[in-house]
Amino acid sequence: MVNPPVWRGSTHLYDDVAHLREGLKSNDDGRFFYGRRGSPTQWSLAEALTEMEPGAAGTMLYPSGVAAISCALLAVLQPGDEVLLTDSSYDPSRSFADVFLKRMGISARYYDPLIGADVATLFGPNTKAILMESPGSLTFEVQDVPAICRAAQAAGIVALLDNTWATSRFFPALEHGVDITIVAATKYIVGHSDVMMGAVTTHDKYWTRLRRTAQQLGQVVSPDDAYLAARGLRTLDVRLRQHEASALQIARWLKQRPEVGLVLHPALPDCPGHEIWKRDFKGASGLFSFELSDGDDQSRAAFIDALTLFGIGYSWGGFESLALPVDPAKHRTATQWAGTGPLVRLNIGLEDPDDLMADLAKGFEHYQSAQS
């Protein structure tokens, strides 16, 4: 059939005690045992995500992207360990490392996202994992993931990557040396802003550990959410291509605007890590930031408030365009943010880009009025 059905059920029944015991023995394969272990609806989505990542052994699903990041780290860390995180990390990743992992006796340090192979100079005797995010979702530095992974592998350190921006469609992470790849499926996988979900994919070495950690922590997604995510997955490629084309058109237009300083889009030559993006990525998604010249918080707010086709919201990757004021300096500890003007992050959705540029032009009129 075209669409796998939504298989709802908390309890799986067995024909007799012999089948019950056989099910218990084969529990490790993640198949029928109890509803928390999933059903064909969840399994079909997980299998599809695994097939999209060359070299993968399996995928676990989680009720949010933060749950996916947290469980992936918990699967490879123990008290006394240290984890390195990019200084451009998603803020909830920092919070989990600085607060929750600290309570468990696990320390965290942050590194310059442009450090590349020199990250090896930061490895200590207790460094057991490194969490990358490339590009960062505020300032969009593209990391040299293959170089970092080679350094990590040589030191016996697990390399994890938040790959939400590119997905495996534009950046097959395991092929570039990553051990464990994470996506907030809420974003581009689902694509319709109606489901929260995370996914973690890995190869044979870490698959059993990842799966058991998720099961022991009771991580499960509903079959209805899995069905909707699978629906989104079917149109992922065509949506990403439209996000890419529209975002790049708008980013180039913004570079010509007198109100704009930096445009932080990895496909633009002056974006940090652009050469790495050209080498490693198959495309760019619809999320990027730009800096307003000579502005302040008040004029930035006037610009955003004047937009009618851009919603104001924290998420991204959906069909709708969003605008958000962001302040990356607040989230840096190992490096300093070099920008001089207020930053705006745009999620370019699936609307007509000409309409979006007209809306942004109207916003710039209000921006200029707020400065006068």
Where do the protein language model's features map onto the residues?
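Short, solvent-exposed amphipathic alpha-helical segments in soluble enzyme
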Residues: 100-102, 216, 305-309, 361-365
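Conserved PLP-enzyme active-site core in the AAT-like
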Residues: 57-257, 264
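Active-site C-terminal subdomain of aminotransferase-like
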Residues: 15-16, 20, 29-30, 37-38, ...
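N-terminal glycine-rich, Lys/His-bearing helix-loop that initiates the first secondary-structure elements
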Residues: 1-29, 369-372
